[in-house]
Amino acid sequence: FILMKTKIQDMTSGSPGRLIILFAIPLMLGNICQQLYTMVDTMVVGQVAGVEALAALGAVDFLMWVVTGISTGLTQGFSIQLSQYYGAKDFENLRKSLAHSYRLTAFIAAGVLILSQSFASLVLTGLHTPSNIIGMSLLYLRIIFCGIPATAAYNMFASALRAMGNSKTPLTAMIIASVLNVSLDILFVAGFGWGVAGAAIATVIAQSFSAVYCFLILRRIDIVHLTRADFMPASGMNARLMKLGIPVVFQNIIIGVGGLVVQYVINGYGFLFVAGFTATNKLYGLLEMAAISYGYAIVTYVGQNLGAGKIDRIRKGVRSSMLLSLLTSLIISAAMFLFGKNILSLFISGEPQQTQQVLAIAFKYLSIMAAMLWVLYFLYVYRSALQGLGDTLMPMVSGMAEFVMRISAALILPHFIGQDGIFFAEIAAWSGATVILCISYYVRMHKYH
């Protein structure tokens, strides 16, 4: 009765593959909406404001990853404990864990907001951001960083809902927010001529709506109706949450910092190369959207079944996820080889000679990533399974491997094969991390014998 009323899902019984697919589909649809928004945003900025504005947005991609990765990592870590309590039907500790997660998220979001605004200019200068775009990049960041509290709140509320098997509410929030974002993008950028500032303002408004929507839905779930007592200090609760959350934060930061080093190298190739790299990175989310969705489904599935003590179901679920991931990655790769150049051309405008050069750079990078996409999908399966098991340390170690491989490839390969070497940095990072995660998962599962 409670599950029907609150629209949450018990994943400790039923077909593992079916449960994972049904959970992942709304997340995929939400990611599609988000990526369509990102593509429209890129098209509007690139077509209306020009190649320099497009490059200005691309120059801050990895810096935004680092900053938003803090709240995303924390809430992902917190949701692991929430899913385990839900799987064990320990609703009292579920409520306490949620209340303490709220408090920690608010405190850390405030700190990140202050630090990010304080050091944004310094970081862009240190990255040698091209002089003709650094002003636009900084303006965009200043506005986006004002939305950090809204982003953190949305991540927290959406993670809590997913931990209890509800992936439909975040989908609804994402659909409405994406429509709102695109509408405001067109109004602010094309209509009012606000350029990158208009794109940033539209994003902050839409993200704020998503947070409010998910919070209102979460409040209607009876088993997590919080009282003042739930916010009272509970022995070891904050420590357990941070033990799960901090490694995920460091994992995200390490990956993001590696990306910043790559961005530093790319900035030295000029703004046309930056624009081409940016165009492909805007499609990157489309490439990995299903992997992210499967990842969230696996974390919830594994966490709930671990809480219920059903280890065999965990193995079956991960095997099903591997097959799903392989098939999905092959389909997406084929689509990128066939239609990737046409999609990329939508993002680029300007002088014919410049646009052809940017398009050639972008499609070469896209082709390399598409060929090895299956590695990224396996990475998500193993990392998410370990996180669901409560192991956030080895995913952090794999993040360090990504960091080392990405930087090494970015700094070394261009000396041997020219600028194209930078495109293989991402592949090297995926491969190193996947090997570590694969070994760690099977070693950990062997212990359950």
List the predicted regions and their residue ranges.
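Short alpha-helical transmembrane segments in multi-pass integral membrane proteins
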Residues: F1-A24, L82-G147, G191-I246, V302-A371, ...
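N-terminal transmembrane alpha-helices
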Residues: M11-V48, F62-G77, Q81, A106-L113, ...
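Transmembrane helical elements of multi-pass membrane transporters/channels
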Residues: L22-D41, I143, Y154, A177, ...
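Transmembrane alpha-helix boundary and packing residues in multipass membrane permease domains
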Residues: L27, N31, M43, I80, ...
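Helix-terminus/linker motif at the lipid-water interface of multi-pass membrane proteins
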Residues: I32, L36-A55, L124-S131, L187-W194, ...
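Small-residue-rich hydrophobic transmembrane alpha-helices
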Residues: L54-I114, T151-P170, G276-G340, L376-S398
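Hydrophobic transmembrane alpha-helices of multi-pass small-molecule transporters
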Residues: V66, N181-D185, A211-F215, L286-M289, ...
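Short runs within selected transmembrane alpha-helices of multi-pass transporters and secretion channels
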Residues: T75, I143-R162, P170-S178, A199-V212, ...
